[in-house]
């Protein structure tokens, strides 16, 4: 019987995993520059953590959660997104305490799970990179985090992107706008999709996020939330746009953008790919401010701002823009052993080379010298060390630069005791030539 991976999942194999490593390591370097530290949470959470934070009426909670009762009859769910688990950890571990620097800056990476129809860039197990910052209402933090996301894409080599922003205001703004939206949508009730009819009185802002074509036509004429911002909300959003202008960061404002999660307040944003090959899957990063979420999960009133991005979607964007990913797995040395008597000596050589901090490999398949040299060439080894029975008896090894084809014999002891000097000598000759 043959087994296959579950629908909507992927095996990330060598050759592809290097691309993932490049994205992840680039993110770590950027986040370090901005003083964000990593946090790791369980891949499953209590159901209420997600339902209370993300919102009962969202598609995620109502349709897409992998939730179940465990053997102790506890209702748990595989995490569908990263922010709620981070907020839960922030509250549970009292990271809001005075001993911690504010804003408390953190990032995460890992798998998320949603039961949805698999398609390009949308899987049932997908992988997310995200950041969260807690403790500051300063609009400058909103701008810093958006700038950090753009910086990350720039470092990856992604160029064809745009920043789209909106404000959802505070609770007072939301309440005023909610009623205005209901008043506008109610006359169109019969024309709305089934989902939007259900949401109209539960959470009317979610109607703005509908993917239904008829809904989109109706929503296009809906009142703008920006016309309902109270003075504090208006001041916050104006400060954000002023600082984006000051930093010369281009952006567009989309007053119908609401995001698919209920916890957002004030600034929200999306970074979209404009690469022609990306098609409908154009949003590659999204986030915003959530000033009530920490309190919702049992913590003190603490503002927050963050974003999330799917690694799969980022890689699709890089592919669409034909970004060349630099080789991460360079091989410094390959040892060719000729004859069965050299088996132990070849093992000693690769271990000695690795002990000096260099990458090394050798043949374990008893292949002929020609096949071993072919492997060294395929692996793009910088140096090839050859040892046969004659060399073993003489206590030497032949070292060849694959770039210059220059070859030199060294004592075996030189490899074991000072390979770094051997490497430098051979590589220096290559540079000189």
UniProtKB/Swiss-Prot annotation:
Its main location: cytoplasm. Transmembrane segments: none annotated. It is found in: Cytoplasm. SUPFAM superfamilies: Class II aaRS ABD-related, Class II aaRS and biotin synthetases. Its EC number is 6.1.1.21. Signal peptide: none annotated. This is Histidine--tRNA ligase. It comes from Enterococcus faecalis (strain ATCC 700802 / V583).
């Amino acid at each position: 019987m043959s087994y296959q991976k579950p629908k909507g999942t992927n095996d990330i194999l060598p050759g592809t995993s290097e691309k993932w490593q490049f994205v992840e390591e680039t993110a770590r370097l950027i986040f370090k520059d901005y003083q964000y530290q990593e946090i790791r949470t369980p891949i499953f959470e209590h159901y209420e953590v997600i339902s209370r934070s993300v919102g009962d009426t969202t598609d995620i909670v109502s349709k897409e959660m992998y939730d179940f009762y465990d053997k102790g009859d506890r209702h748990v769910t595989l995490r569908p997104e990263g922010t709620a688990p981070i907020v839960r950890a922030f509250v549970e571990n009292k990271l809001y305490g005075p001993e911690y620097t504010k804003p408390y800056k953190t990032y995460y990476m890992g798998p998320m799970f949603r039961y949805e129809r698999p398609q390009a860039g949308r899987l049932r197990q997908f992988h997310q990179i995200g950041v969260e910052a807690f403790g500051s209402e300063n609009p400058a933090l909103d701008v810093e985090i958006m700038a950090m996301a753009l910086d990350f894409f720039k470092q990856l080599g992604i160029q064809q992107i745009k920043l789209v922003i909106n404000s959802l205001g505070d609770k007072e703004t939301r309440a005023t706008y909610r009623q205005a939206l209901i008043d506008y949508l109610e006359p169109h009730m019969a024309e709305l999709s089934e989902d939007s009819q259900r949401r109209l009185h539960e959470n009317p802002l979610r109607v703005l996020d509908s993917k239904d074509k008829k809904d989109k036509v109706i929503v296009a004429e809906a009142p703008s939330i920006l016309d309902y911002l109270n003075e504090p909300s208006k001041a916050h959003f104006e400060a954000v746009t002023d600082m984006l202008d000051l930093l010369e960061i281009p952006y567009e404002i989309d007053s119908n953008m609401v995001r698919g999660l209920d916890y957002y307040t004030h600034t929200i944003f999306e970074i979209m790919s404009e690469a022609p090959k990306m098609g409908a899957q154009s949003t590659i990063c999204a986030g915003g401010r959530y000033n009530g979420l920490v309190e919702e999960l049992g913590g003190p009133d603490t503002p927050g701002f963050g974003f999330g991005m799917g690694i799969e979607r980022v890689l699709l964007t890089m592919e669409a823009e034909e970004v060349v990913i630099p080789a991460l797995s360079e091989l410094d040395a390959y040892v060719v052993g000729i004859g069965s008597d050299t088996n132990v000596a070849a093992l000693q050589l690769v271990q000695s080379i690795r002990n000096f901090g260099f990458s090394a490999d050798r043949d374990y398949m008893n292949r002929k010298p020609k096949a071993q040299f072919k492997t060294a060439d395929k692996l793009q080894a910088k140096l090839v060390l050859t040892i046969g029975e004659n060399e073993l008896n003489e206590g030497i090894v032949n070292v060849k630069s694959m770039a210059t084809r220059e070859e030199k014999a060294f004592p075996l002891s030189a490899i074991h005791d000072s390979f770094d000097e051997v490497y430098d000598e051979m590589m220096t000759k290559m540079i000189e030539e």
